[in-house]
Design a protein with these regions (language model features):
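Terminal-region recognition feature
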Residues: 1-174
Length: 174
């Protein structure tokens, strides 16, 4: 009987429905975390998935402000040469981040209404290279800012959840 129960459970289901707090060790149900803004009872702040954050901020629906095309995220053609991973290209990491997140850059920019006021929100996605801030992110940020200025939105929000400027892109990361 026990084997039948375990066979019916999809593999990895516990990973998708539950989150373990690294601070208090409590296991929380993810839908409950959404309603607490991904903050544990012990006040630990989990990474709030950007799309869920946007869902929680906007009144009903939002439009994504797409990343500009043809921006080189690796203008230095950086190649890592350390003992662990000899000679891999940084662009390979960026391609991996794109595949994992489904995003072109570490930003998700959106427009919609918050409390019946027009708004543009920019969220960093820490799953995209720690929320890197390189040339592609700079251009995406500027596109969202230009959109906000052009539309004269009431609210401009930037949720900065990032590891910082991407050192692999040099001065172009500024």
């Amino acid at each position: 009987r026990v084997k039948q129960i375990f066979k019916k459970q999809p593999i990895g289901q516990e990973e998708t429905d539950w989150k373990n707090c690294p601070q208090c060790k409590k296991i929380s149900y993810k839908p409950d975390l959404f309603y607490s803004s991904y903050i544990c009872e012990c006040s630990y702040h989990f990474d709030f998935p950007p799309k869920l954050r946007l869902d929680s901020l906007f009144d009903s629906g939002y439009e994504i402000i797409e990343a500009p095309k043809n921006i080189n995220p690796d203008p230095l053609n950086f190649e890592v040469k350390d003992g662990a991973q000899e000679g891999y290209k940084y662009m390979d990491k960026i391609k991996k981040y794109r595949k994992v997140t489904g995003q072109e850059t570490a930003l998700i920019c959106a427009s919609g209404n918050i409390s019946n006021l027009s708004a543009v929100v920019v969220c960093f996605n820490p799953k995209f290279g720690g929320g890197r801030f390189g040339p592609a992110e700079n251009e995406h940020f500027l596109k969202a800012a230009s959109f906000a200025i052009e539309k004269k939105v009431d609210i401009w929000i930037v949720i900065y959840q990032s590891s910082g400027i991407d050192v692999h892109s040099g001065i172009t990361g500024l």
